[in-house]
């Protein structure tokens, strides 16, 4: 296999004599830096770096409350796997946490408010369904109640990447970095619980679109907000360029009531606004290396 340098200490990774397979965790990696506890996935081209300890994939000054949050995420069945995946250099969850936590730790929520084009100041943020500003806000329990009322399995509650609340609106943010929006076959019976007439102009079109992840967020978000809801799809521009040419995606958009409240926000636009703000270079670089 190709020799790989450790991204931390720059030394050549040691190769282990183990059977090659898709690396789902550090121990599966043939190439590893034992000193730094970082492995390279077994892909022949552009391997993903996998940290044995997921915390080492997050800047140390942004680790506050990460462990507590991970212990409370709504999808309880996925908690341990979520920790492992946070250790991947390609992790969308890592990007989501770094992006939001920077503004929280550095008291820069007005900058985030501007980037997301929110009218009012931010009063609460939830990461994977867990409150980050006011633990007594009741928002987590409200979200659980909605998932329960829709008939979701208690072990697999939907946990939106990011929820941002102001006095006038609730905003769900679905974060994408390398992959597209999740699609599932239209014959999946799980669709039915989310396809409520009051949120869609054409239920069959929504189902046929196969955009299962966005449909779940659209329905749960509308119920959560009660009024003034937005769903932001935060992703690289190339994802939107591809999906906007997809007939299934057009079906999804056209099936939504108040489709203007579904917003495509590119990472490129976010970076443009970050450059105009008083943002530390390390934060900009952390996001850039993971997204582009």
Stretch-by-stretch model annotation:
Residues 1-292:
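Charged, terminal alpha-helix-loop-beta segments
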């Amino acid at each position: 296999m190709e020799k790989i340098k450790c991204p931390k200490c720059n030394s050549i990774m040691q190769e282990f004599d183990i059977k090659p397979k898709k690396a789902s965790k550090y121990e599966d990696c043939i190439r590893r830096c034992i000193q730094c506890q970082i492995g390279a996935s077994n892909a022949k081209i552009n391997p993903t770096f996998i940290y044995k300890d997921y915390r080492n994939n997050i800047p140390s000054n942004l680790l506050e409350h990460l462990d507590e949050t991970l212990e409370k995420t709504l999808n309880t069945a996925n908690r341990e796997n979520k920790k492992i995946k946070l250790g991947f250099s390609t992790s969308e969850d890592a990007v989501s946490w770094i992006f939001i936590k920077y503004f929280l730790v550095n008291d820069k929520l007005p900058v985030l408010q501007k980037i997301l084009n929110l009218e009012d100041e931010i009063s609460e943020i939830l990461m994977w369904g867990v409150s980050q500003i006011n633990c007594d806000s009741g928002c987590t329990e409200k979200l659980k109640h909605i998932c329960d009322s829709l008939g979701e399995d208690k072990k697999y509650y939907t946990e939106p990447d990011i929820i941002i609340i102001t006095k006038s609106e609730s905003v769900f943010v679905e974060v994408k970095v390398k992959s597209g929006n999740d699609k599932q076959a239209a014959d999946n019976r799980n669709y039915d619980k989310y396809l409520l007439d009051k949120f869609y102009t054409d239920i069959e079109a929504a189902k046929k679109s196969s955009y299962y992840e966005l449909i779940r967020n659209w329905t749960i978000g509308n119920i959560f907000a009660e009024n003034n809801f937005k769903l932001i799809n935060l992703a690289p521009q190339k994802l939107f360029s591809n999906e906007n040419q997809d007939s299934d995606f057009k079906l999804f958009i056209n099936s939504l009531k108040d489709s203007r409240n579904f917003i495509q926000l590119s990472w490129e636009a976010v970076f443009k606004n970050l450059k105009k703000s008083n943002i530390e270079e390390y934060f900009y670089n952390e996001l850039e290396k993971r997204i582009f």
